[in-house]
């Protein structure tokens, strides 16, 4: 493919494997579309799917997946640790090869229109946002599914596509956007005290005076009896994974808490891992040209 777009739809189902497989199957065996990865989390009750393909070819499988979510996920019955406002909660498009950000925004608008035609309210966010207030996903999703009926009464929060005055009664709303690649990364702690995780997340995230390009929140993992700091690094070239991990480690020491593991959610650029390898291994004068796979792909 000469033109490659990535899309990472997030679905509010992480426990029912039958429904998850129905959703993921929408992206299998499609012309000019490749399913790269999908991962589900029971505590978050969420599934993240990573797909690449020709921009036009991505539309049909995405609409099929929305329809599966519409038929099988009732947000009135949904619970989970991750903020959410819809059955397909977010759908970011990321340009990979031969595609400009302007074209990515146009695709987000086109897909948003198609989803809106299913009587589902659609909010554009990040680079595709229709106003500065909607660039930040956290602001768009504030109130979550339960709070959207009241929120959408405000003229400032009418949907960009689909019904303007309230969410779909079972599906809720969806945010469709255009952005550059980000790293979804979690740090697990050896405590079950959510207050500790919330404090650390507040110190680490940019909005709380922490690291630039980091969004973070504390999450309770009940099945494992621990908590984690769930993070999005929106520009890993400016704030790296190791910087985020080390700040979490530093703040955790205040409470006598240790980092016991980390998790990568979905896919991430190789360069993001190389940064951390250089730091922790103390590699001097390293170049991506020294990575075997990089040279093979040239």
Name each model-derived stretch.
Residues 1-298:
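Long, contiguous binding/interaction regions
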């Amino acid at each position: 493919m000469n033109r490659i777009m990535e899309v990472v739809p997030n679905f509010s189902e992480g426990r029912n494997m039958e429904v998850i497989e129905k959703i993921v199957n929408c992206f299998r065996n499609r012309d000019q579309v490749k399913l790269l990865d999908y991962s589900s989390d029971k505590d978050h009750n969420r599934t993240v799917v990573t797909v690449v393909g020709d921009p036009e070819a991505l539309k049909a499988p995405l609409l099929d997946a929305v329809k599966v979510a519409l038929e099988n996920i009732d947000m009135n019955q949904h619970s989970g640790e991750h903020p959410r406002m819809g059955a397909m909660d977010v759908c970011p498009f990321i340009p990979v090869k031969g595609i400009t950000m302007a074209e990515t925004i146009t695709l987000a608008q086109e897909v948003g229109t198609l989803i809106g035609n299913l009587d589902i309210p659609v909010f554009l966010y990040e680079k595709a946002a229709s106003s500065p207030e909607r660039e930040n996903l956290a602001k768009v999703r504030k109130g979550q599914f339960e709070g959207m009926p009241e929120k959408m009464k405000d003229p400032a929060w009418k949907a960009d596509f689909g019904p303007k005055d309230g969410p779909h009664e079972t599906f809720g709303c969806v945010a469709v956007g255009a952005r550059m690649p980000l790293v979804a990364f979690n740090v697990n702690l050896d405590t079950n005290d959510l207050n500790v995780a919330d404090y650390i997340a507040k110190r680490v995230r940019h909005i709380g005076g922490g690291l630039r390009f980091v969004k973070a929140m504390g999450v309770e993992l009940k099945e494992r009896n621990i908590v984690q700091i769930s993070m999005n690094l929106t520009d890993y070239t400016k704030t790296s994974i190791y910087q985020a991990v080390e700040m979490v480690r530093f703040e955790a020491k205040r409470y006598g808490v240790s980092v016991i593991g980390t998790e990568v959610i979905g896919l991430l650029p190789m360069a993001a891992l190389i940064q951390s390898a250089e730091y922790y291994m103390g590699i001097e004068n390293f170049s991506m040209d020294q990575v075997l796979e990089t040279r093979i792909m040239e």
